[in-house]
């Protein structure tokens, strides 16, 4: 649903739309998670608060060795889909995520590898994103 919006935002921010869409699919359970629903609209599982707004929900984490554990965490609450999408690209602007930018990668797989263990604690995060990108042929959104 958000393919063209993702293409536009990714193009303007040196990102891969395919990765952006795959992250939204994975992090929001294809838009079915409580976090991705109204009023939070957090499609990317970004923790913390947005303009002082957050919601606390249970989530699985990975200890970096493939061992999952369960915690309650505060996640950003956006109030609109547009705010969620824009905050995602703003979130990836920092030097911490320089490895996901198109100008620093050969392809989307380099970007998903750079997210693994950094954006998410899941040690198989990049593999999961790659599978989603391939399954739904999301690279069509990487052309501008």
Give residue spans per PLM region.
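Catalytic cores of secreted/periplasmic lytic hydrolases that degrade extracellular macromolecules
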Residues: 1-144
